[in-house]
Amino acid sequence: AFNDGKLEPAVVVPINGSPQDIAMSLSGKQCAVASPWSRQVTLVALENGTEGQTLPRKTAEARLPFAPGLQAFCRDDTLLVVADAFGGQLALVDPRNGKLLGTRLIEAHGIRGLAASRDGKSLHLSHQRIESAAPTTRNRVFWGQVISNILRSISVDHLLEDDGKRSGGAKLVAHWSLYPFGSPSKAAGDPGAVTVGTLGTTMVALGGVDRIGLRPKPGHVFEEIEVGDRPVAIALGPLERYGYVANFFDDSISVVDTAAAEVVRTISLGPERKLSSAEKGEKLFYDAKLSLDGWYSCHSCHPDGHTHGQLNDNLGDDTYGTPKRVPTLLGTSNTGPWGWIGNRTTLWEQVEKSIETTMRGGKPEPPTVEALVAYLELFDTSPPGNAAVDSSAVARGRQVFERLKCSKCHRPPTYTNVGTYDVGLQDETGQGFYNPPSLKGLQHRSSFLHDNRAATLSGALELHQPVSIRSLRRTDHADLLSF
């Protein structure tokens, strides 16, 4: 409600698991709420009260096999498409009952734009795609061969097809049209919000480089336009004459004349204040211009501080040809040393090396590193999920963990330590000694071990096989996984 110039809550609906995205149905009679950490989508009916007020009512909850992010209603509100908050999966949900109809997989991570065409026949996604085998040499980064920035359009009919071809339980999406953003010397890191008008106007936020892409009709080339600092949301006005772009870091709205393809007005949302070191670090974290030509930012591989879960060949272990899983940064300030082989003893050193050799942005100035470190120190571990947990199994699992002396490598409270250990899993160069990753937030990882060779935690234990686990009873094994 809007009272005396202030917005106030009119009705509060409890939603589990730290909700982060809301999508409205085309009719306006329903919304969907995504909660990434609990891997849940909550469906809410928006009913009219006797006095004209809106009365929200939870109608269903959909449990997903991945963390949900953006959502879009399609097909006259009979289909809800839910995008992966970190990786490249899509879920198809029946919004009438919350039933999961299936999951789909595309070669993607960082899906930050999702919009259905007005006729409901196509779905448009902005995302990035990493080439895990491509080393982060200057030449590879320059040509956009490490991370590409993409607008992908997929037929909704094709999404609903099921030919049985699967990868890890999800059907592979085989047909699409693809538009790559960026070119050498003028890349377009971190594509974000997408809006598609009824007349065919399409606008895409290029958040990492402070530009938007604009095309008047499908099939036309996008024209890139400079806007404010990190555009994150876009709306089209009547007759699509103007587009309105919300810029996150400078608190402004850019008004774009879509015919002239230029900003005609900038609306300030208030005076900017002096930023703390951590706030400066936040701006840098989302700034693709920190990399060579602007191909990608820290956020590209560590979406909102977490991880896209894929491999990157970035000299983290001082070698090429040995791609490793990108780790989460949540809680990272407490889990040193850094790097899979523990070869960075300070977070400062890790940040500096990442900018130089992963992003090829040159040697950063000390204030840049200082600000990024200050921002990373704010990252707490990811919250627990809300899935039903057997507390007695967790308690028994803790006892198994202690009895097997798992804490020798994974010491509470961070569940890691400063050493390196031979775990019997060598990389391409024969390297077998690794610094144990923290076990905090383990339930929010989609793959395990340094090269993602294990798709489940149980599979990781089978491959890792510490001596103490090899003769473990099945019930103790299950309890350990619960813990």
Predicted segments with their positions:
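Beta-propeller blade repeat segments, especially FG-GAP/WD-type strand-to-loop junctions
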Residues: 1-5, 43-48, 217
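Contiguous, function-dense segments enriched for cysteine-driven chemistry
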Residues: 1, 17, 34-41, 61-62, ...
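Surface loop/turn motifs at the tips and blade-to-blade linkers of beta-strand repeat domains
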Residues: 12-16, 61-66, 104-107, 182-186, ...
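Short, solvent-exposed loop/turn segments that connect beta-strands within catalytic domains
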Residues: 5-6, 49-55, 78, 121, ...
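A structural motif specific to WD40 beta-propellers
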Residues: 8-10, 52, 57-59, 101-102, ...
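Periplasmic c-type cytochrome electron-transfer domains
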Residues: 40, 74, 88, 93-98, ...
